[in-house]
Amino acid sequence: MPSATSTNGANGNGNGNGASASPAPGNLSANDNIRRFAAPSRPLSPLPAHALFNEKTRCFVYGLQPRAVQGMLDFDFICKRSTPSVAGIIYTFGGQFVSKMYWGTSETLLPVYQEVQKAIAKHPDVDVVVNFASSRSVYSSTMELMEHPQIKTIAIIAEGVPERRAREIAYVAKKKGITIIGPATVGGIKPGCFKIGNTGGMMDNIVASKLYRKGSVGYVSKSGGMSNELNNIISQTTDGVYEGVAIGGDRYPGTTFIDHLLRYQADPACKILVLLGEVGGVEEYKVIEAVKQGIITKPIVAWAIGTCASMFKTEVQFGHAGAFANSQLETAATKNKSMREAGFYVPDTFEDMPALLKQVYDKLVADGTIVPAPEPVVPKIPIDYSWAQELGLIRKPAAFISTISDDRGQELLYAGMPISDVFREEIGIGGVMSLLWFRRRLPDYAAKFLEMVLMLTADHGPAVSGAMNTIITTRAGKDLISSLVAGLLTIGSRFGGALDGAAEEFTKAFDKGLSPREFVDTMRKQNKLIPGIGHRVKSRNNPDLRVELVKEYVKAKFPSSKLLDYALAVETVTTSKKDNLILNVDGCIAVCFVDLLRNCGAFSTEEAEDYLSMGVLNGLFVLGRSIGLIAHYLDQKRLRTGLYRHPWDDITYLLPSLQQPGPPGTEGRVEVQI
């Protein structure tokens, strides 16, 4: 299975994003626009104790989250990583396959594994998992992941994880030395290195917040949404974010403020700490104690959200499960006061936080603690075609045009008519055909005529060629579609396909002003049979009742039946020669349909001619006869009939006889004696 780690540092795209130029054996060719990354042969070197991520961090994404994965790969690309941060996807329901993603403007394939064990064995360099499992299954999946010593960090995105389960996960993780971020978190980000899931928002926001390169400020918050605001504030007032983590809003997060701030304290590249707490819980006091004891010495800019809670007469539950003060100690106002007294940089309001942060940053720049790095070139953002089209940035000609139906909105439309109106107005099958076939509502009598044609052509017994083909195919054990198609493929000029020809010939003669006898004589001189005239069984004395039904309906309902009258006059001429040269059902339907197109008021003359030339009449026969062919399939299946073999006594065998050797050059010739 393809993997997604770099084979070399080759710059395959001009952006410093290394990838292999040649495909692995057995894969597609090198010009298929697929970016390939070979699997590593050994695990990466362990990170320092204070670091969770670096520019080589690799992870699994647990759960099928293509948008989040694509966001992570886009972040990797603009950070100029040599390989994607996502090594593979673990999806326990779908089997093992590959998922196609973009690496810049090229495509790459990410393996999808059904089992954690297989994924772990295949990728020894992975030590992070972004777990998108639901609140119902996140406990079991996280416990399974923690059984593998290779995994060092797990981000749990799901909200609503039972508190007992969350505490158990945190307990086991602490024993095993695993860092848990979450539950109920958007994740975290280390600019220029790695981002968890949807952290940082869309790519334009990530670029605006300068998260594609490292800064000097490390922050920790509960809220994922507010972490995005911190990214924005820090990018505008300092040299940018060094690392940011949202620990999650539940009451029992896997790691707390102090865990991450101690990491930042130990990291020499992180110069300023930012703590964004909130009402509820006492985790901020652990940080206060660490500052008082001199464990944390770096400057901390801090604020606890929720000071407005004191304005309410009763305690208020804010958005997070943990945002509820059970005592005065847990209120935001008390926390802010305590942090200020401990030496934190605490603004008077959250709105004052950017100015205070800039003040602290400028001070560290002035004393040389922070040396701002030159600003790199802003990377180009690969943008999805669908997003660019939605923004109106691009246009392209459509590959297909459809004028009959639209499923893009809330309700399906048939030629502009909502499907609910189709049923509310009870337009029936004929009405639906008028919308989809002709893109307009036809009069009720016309829709009824269409339904009548379908009913009349639905079946004509098992002896006709179409039904026989379907029956034989069914008895050979084939499926419904194969058996139906076998019958439909017999429809043509000799079986069921006379409708278009009859409409063409009768219309041409009528429009030329030929009398019925002149029309018959002309066809005879051309050695042509008249389509729609003649029947193998029915005759003038044994009429086809289907034809009688059509004639009766058309005479009663149609505003004009000139072509039908002309065809009946032709029938008078032909039956005078032979009794079975009657106007058959194909011919009758054809001429009546022409009368409908020309006289119902819904079509212009040109439109009527166009629909006839398109083959719409044969379409009526195909649609109607499909009903009967499916019926024959079901009938044979119901009867459990076996494979059909034609009897010998119904076949005349006429075999060729080989002559004695003749003159040179005649070898191999055979003569059939009949």
From Swiss-Prot:
One Pfam family from the record: Citrate_synt
Catalysed reaction, written as an equation: oxaloacetate + acetyl-CoA + ADP + phosphate = citrate + ATP + CoA
Enzyme class: transferase
Binding of CoA, residues: 339-349
GO CC annotations on file: cytosol
Documented EC number(s): 2.3.3.8
One GO BP annotation of this record: fatty acid biosynthetic process
Keywords for the protein's UniProt record, in alphabetical order: ATP-binding, Cytoplasm, Lipid biosynthesis, Lipid metabolism, Magnesium, Metal-binding, Nucleotide-binding, Phosphoprotein, Transferase
Stretches the record annotates as Disordered: 1-26
Positions of ATP binding: 261-281, 312-338
Gene Ontology molecular function: ATP binding; ATP citrate synthase activity; metal ion binding
First-listed, main subcellular location of the protein, grouped into a coarse class: cytoplasm
Keyword presence, Nucleotide-binding: yes
Protein's name in the database: ATP-citrate synthase subunit 1
Species in which this protein is naturally found: Sordaria macrospora (strain ATCC MYA-333 / DSM 997 / K(L3346) / K-hell)
Lineage of the organism: Eukaryota, Fungi, Dikarya, Ascomycota, Pezizomycotina
